[in-house]
Amino acid sequence: MILTVALGVYSCASGKGRYADVDASEPELDVQLLDVNPYSRPGIQSEGINGVVIHYTANPGSTAQENRDYFNGLQYSQETEASSNFIVGLDGEIIQCVPTWEVAYASNERNYDTVSIEVCHPDETGEFTDETYESLVQLTAWLCVKFSLTEDDVIRHYDVTGKICPKYFVEHEDAWEAFKENVGDAIRKTQEETQE
């Protein structure tokens, strides 16, 4: 299992053109909304969506389900305020935790006008698996189309607060630019298909 995961890690810097088939169609979502509570789903309506913020879990090897359950459990532990609208898992699965029109506690002052995506990663590098990366591109592109955004409206948690998140995309600027290019390509592919 570990070998499979290690071999499936996407080398962001070199994979720029390998996601040409990814488009901005709605991905398969496992909707598991958090209970409304003051620690992870306050039930506050967003002020409008002006961007998509990418995060990483900073918890190597944890699954999307484990992260979703952690967010939901904050209503009991009351240890912090944290959540995201979506979590992309190690196998590319996507769990929706908070509706896109509601605030998630992920991006500080940008909580009120962005959608947040938390991304699972197999190891300390913060690099994503191929399956995770492909789902992240599709989900991000779909959200951009849904809210009339472009890849230029996609930011890292780092761009809001200076926090090293998502780690791999902060430490490898070329990988971040390649990701945004992949998102832009997926958006344009879908727009071209709808015009035909």
Regions found by a protein language model. Give the residues of each.
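N-terminal catalytic cores of peptidoglycan-degrading enzymes
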Residues: L7-S107
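Basic/polar, cationic surfaces and motifs that engage anionic cell-wall
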Residues: C12-L29, D123-E196
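Extracytoplasmic/periplasmic, Sec-exported soluble proteins
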Residues: I44-S46, Q78-E79, Y105-E109, E124-S135, ...
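Cell-envelope and extracellular/periplasmic
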Residues: T57-A58, R110, V115-E124
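Active-site-proximal helix/loop segments of hydrolytic enzymes
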Residues: Q78, N85, G89, P122, ...
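Catalytic nucleophile-His microenvironment captured as a short glycine-rich beta-strand/loop
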Residues: S83-V88, V115-H121, C144
